[in-house]
Amino acid sequence: MGITGSKARWSCLTLATAILALFFGETDMLTGAAADRMKVSLGTATPGGGFPVYGQAVAETINQTDPSLSVEPRNTRGSAENVPLLEAGQLDLALVQGESAYEALNGIGRPRADLWILAAMYASPGMFIVRADSPYRSIDDLKGKPVVFGAAGSGLGILARYVLDGLGLDRDRDFQPIFLEHAGDGPPLVLEGRAAALWGGSVGWPPFLAVAQGPAGGRFIIPDAAGVQRILSTHPFLKPITVQAGSFPGQVVPLHTVGSWSFILTRRTLPDNLAYRLAKALHQAQEVLSRRLPQARETAAANTIGAAPRLDLIHPGVQRYLRELGMLR
């Protein structure tokens, strides 16, 4: 009995040791696998706006689709800071609003930025929102009034400058412009009556939703049809954009305005193979990304091709993947 009991205890001890070894071995393997994931930094913008929400959705989607990658979003001051951070190699990827990308890639008002396009994000229709109980119904009604034009480093402020210029207005002289530290600070100014309107863009933009869902509701103000044509004639790089009815609470009619496409840009030295893997993950998980964030349904390979100012601005690694899809020659 003593010998049998000793053997039994020895067998149990051996089994327990084996289980522990297996457990810790698997833990080490998992830890090692996590450590081996390639980290990719992604610059977004200030908290409270659309870029951080979009960046988080993109990062989670890519990381889930390609476990060898670890895309890590980082709050920044927005498009105006993201471009120089990419140029300095301090970010791998960054979200850049359309007008900021246009100026940077074409060297308007600054040296030309030597960067690549990874993907088109979504179209940003430029609009004002006011409280539904306010007397303001046109852009002219807002002249001389305090208007929130977004965070100081946001590309949306640049979009406002181009749109208003096309109407013969000056953003900084014809209005009382308010620029913010954080995009999320804008809605309270309108809701509390300290600002007449909030300028912004894109369907699902959190500050627009905050005003539209406020106690008084919201009303959008856009250029009229003649104004849209004036803007497009003055600044042809802008595009006509329609916001479908029902895109926001209380919005019962389509809104026809102008805007531009925002982009995910990359540093110039991002390896071709890495850009290829990122583009592939985005394409393969397009439906997953759309479910995470409905506005990201526009993050599609076809839109990248259509929205890029020139095809040679698309990263060579992305171009290789698009050729494999049969979308580029």
Where are the regions a protein language model picked out?
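Bilobed "Venus flytrap"/periplasmic-binding protein-like clamshell domains
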Residues: 39-65, 69-70, 124-192, 308, ...
